[in-house]
């Protein structure tokens, strides 16, 4: 287990490394018609342009080592969390109505923590995690959720199974969870987004909660336009993060099916084709953001997408079918370029995520907690598999 000093040293090394290579990950992949590193790293761009297909992370690392003389990769020595010797396995009907991958996340999270009563389940939804914790760890659980209908459904299920779990209809962002934390010894949050998990950290510190287990998610879901660090170490860091950087930290899709991935590729091609069209027609060289669209629109073809996107931006283009085909083709060509840019950015994704996780761990360390950062499951179950556990020092 790393000490606070150990986490601080790791954070400083990581911060310096990310700052040194910021030009490689702090870019807008689809805003430029050219590779964004033509001036700074022409050999890397030449390699990307000539590479057949999308490079793997290992291939990107090899290219960075080859073309950037000062580059050295960061190495992480992740610990495998030791599982408790005995946990009571729930009956199969316990997971009824919960999708397989979600249930696997809940099981893995519960196996990886050691809470004591009373446990606050933060942003509980229907309280599936809380039910398993109450059952396996023999703890009383207080589940906080802002949607009343989910509270009602969760309470009905807990009563049916005679689980020691109660629900409160609570808006934690308005401070309504403070009293529950003051009465609790433990608090848990599985994939609470952005401001939700950072609010838990701050309010748990204030309430002197003895034990915390948090798997952070969606750091970009915050009111702030730029990232506001939690710890003193991150506040003094060289690396400053925008909303786009925060999105990159969690931009890893390992669960998309073939159909879902195909639709994403088609939508990206249509958006990039429309972008090329509007740049040409309006004689300007900047990306034009278009709102999200319904997936059904993609089945109607590129011409229908252009009509829809034009209406969204109050534009009108008169184009022949040949011209539309040309811009659609450009869109698909640009998809390959964007994917190559993103593969370089993705190489730094996990490091950005760890920077954010360390910020949270250091905030807890600075306020009297002993923290541990681990992975609670394989990334095939969920890419957001990092767990922060914290015990308040005596």
Positions of PLM-derived features:
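Conserved class I S-adenosyl-L-methionine
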Residues: 117-125
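Short amphipathic alpha-helix with an adjacent loop that forms part of the alpha/beta core around
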Residues: 175-183
């Amino acid at each position: 287990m790393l000490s606070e000093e150990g986490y601080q040293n790791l954070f400083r090394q990581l911060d310096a490394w990310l700052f040194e290579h910021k030009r490689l990950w702090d870019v807008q992949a689809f805003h430029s018609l050219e590779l964004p590193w033509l001036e700074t790293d022409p050999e890397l761009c030449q390699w990307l342009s000539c590479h057949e297909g999308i490079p793997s992370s290992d291939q990107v690392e090899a290219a960075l080592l080859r073309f950037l003389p000062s580059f050295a990769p960061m190495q992480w020595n992740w610990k495998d969390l030791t599982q408790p010797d005995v946990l009571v396995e729930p009956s199969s009907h316990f997971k009824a109505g919960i999708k397989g991958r979600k249930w696997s996340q809940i099981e893995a999270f519960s196996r990886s923590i050691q809470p004591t009563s009373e446990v606050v389940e933060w942003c509980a939804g229907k309280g599936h995690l809380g039910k398993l914790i109450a059952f396996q760890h023999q703890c009383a659980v207080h589940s906080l959720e802002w949607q009343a209908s989910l509270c009602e459904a969760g309470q009905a299920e807990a009563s049916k199974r005679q689980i020691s779990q109660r629900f409160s209809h609570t808006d934690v962002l308005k401070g309504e969870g403070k009293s529950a934390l003051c009465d609790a010894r433990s608090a848990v949050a599985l994939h609470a987004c952005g401001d939700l998990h950072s609010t838990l950290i701050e309010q748990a510190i204030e309430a002197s909660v003895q034990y915390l287990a948090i798997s952070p998610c969606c750091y970009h879901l915050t009111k702030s336009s730029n990232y506001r660090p939690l710890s003193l170490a991150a506040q003094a860091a060289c690396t400053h993060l925008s909303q786009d950087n925060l999105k990159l930290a969690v931009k890893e899709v390992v669960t998309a099916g073939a159909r879902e991935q195909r639709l994403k590729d088609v939508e990206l091609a249509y958006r990039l084709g429309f972008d090329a069209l509007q740049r040409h027609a309006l004689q300007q060289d900047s990306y034009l953001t278009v709102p999200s669209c319904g997936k059904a629109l993609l089945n109607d073809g590129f011409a229908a997408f252009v009509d829809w996107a034009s209406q969204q931006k109050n534009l009108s283009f008169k184009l022949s079918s040949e011209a539309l085909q040309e811009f659609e083709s450009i869109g698909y060509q640009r998809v390959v370029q964007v994917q190559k840019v993103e593969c370089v950015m993705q190489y730094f994704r996990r490091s950005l995520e760890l920077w954010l996780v360390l910020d949270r761990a250091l905030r807890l360390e600075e306020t009297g907690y002993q923290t541990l950062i681990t992975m609670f499951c394989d990334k095939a179950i969920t890419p957001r598999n990092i767990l922060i556990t914290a015990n308040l020092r005596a």
